[in-house]
Structures are given as C-alpha cells and as structure tokens.
C-alpha cells in the first residue's frame, strides 16, 4: 500500500471513529468492585426501556463489578438472574468488541438484542451493531474471550 493511500485510510478512520475513540478511555474502569454501567440500573433497560440512574442504597456486587439499582425490586431481580441483566462484555462497547477492541461504553447508548443488554461508545456503533446484531454479537463474544482480562492503563 502506498504511503499516500495509507495516509488517506488513516484520515478516513480518524473521521469515522475519532469522536467515539477520543471520548472514552481505552478500557472500562477496573479494580476491585468497579462501578458497572457508570451507576445506571441494568434492570431498568429491560423494565423501563431507559437508562435509569441507580442509588447506593441498592447495590449488588457481581463478578467483581458493583451495580446500582433504582429500587429494591430491580436489585432483587438482578440477584435472581444476574446473567440476564448484566451488560454483555463487561459493559465494554459491543461494536468495538466485535472489531477486537476493548473500549469503554456510554451506558446511555444501548440496545437490547436477543434478550441481552449491549452498550456502545457511540450511536454509529450502536446502529452498525443493530443491523447485524446476531453476527456482531458472535464476533464480539469470540473477541471477549481474549480481551476480557485486559487491564486498564
């Protein structure tokens, strides 16, 4: 590939992904009991169809992640079936994960597909994922196996 062509591809990539990539750190917050979904209630995406802030009074730690809930009912629903409500890929951007990149997501940009919660770094990624949700989810799941233990920098 010529230097000019490589440069043009770099410019295209920067324009297409630059805003999304510049907004969020490379990896979601890590460490003991990191706060999942930046404090949003994971059950509310399913029951209220909206990102809803949780409160510290209703917290649960699951797989080293601390989740907050808007009310006791949501907390109890999560405790009964955490795998149903927890975001896929540890709350990392699902579209980036499908592309082999672990990137923190914005929990206000989300999608429920095939009964699972996916969050995204930007609305363009959300739309690309939605168009081929099953295939993108499979690619992301395959990449998650190797990227899930990637540490924060």
Each language-model region and where it sits:
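N-terminal secretory signal peptides and thylakoid transit peptides that target proteins
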Residues: 1-14
């Amino acid at each position: 590939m010529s230097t000019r062509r490589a440069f043009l591809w770099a410019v295209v990539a920067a324009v297409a992904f630059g805003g999304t990539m510049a907004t969020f750190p490379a990896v979601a917050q890590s460490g003991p009991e990191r706060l999942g979904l930046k404090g949003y209630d994971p059950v509310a995406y399913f029951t209220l169809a909206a990102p809803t802030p949780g409160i510290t009074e209703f917290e649960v730690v699951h797989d080293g992640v601390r989740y907050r809930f808007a009310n006791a009912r949501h907390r109890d629903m999560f405790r009964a079936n955490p795998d149903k409500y927890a975001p896929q890929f540890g709350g990392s951007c699902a579209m980036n994960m499908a592309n082999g990149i672990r990137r923190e997501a914005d929990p206000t940009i989300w999608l429920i597909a095939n009964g699972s919660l996916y969050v995204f770094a930007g609305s363009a990624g959300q739309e690309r994922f939605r168009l081929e949700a099953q295939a993108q989810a499979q690619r992301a799941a395959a990449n998650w196996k190797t990227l899930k233990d990637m540490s924060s920098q």
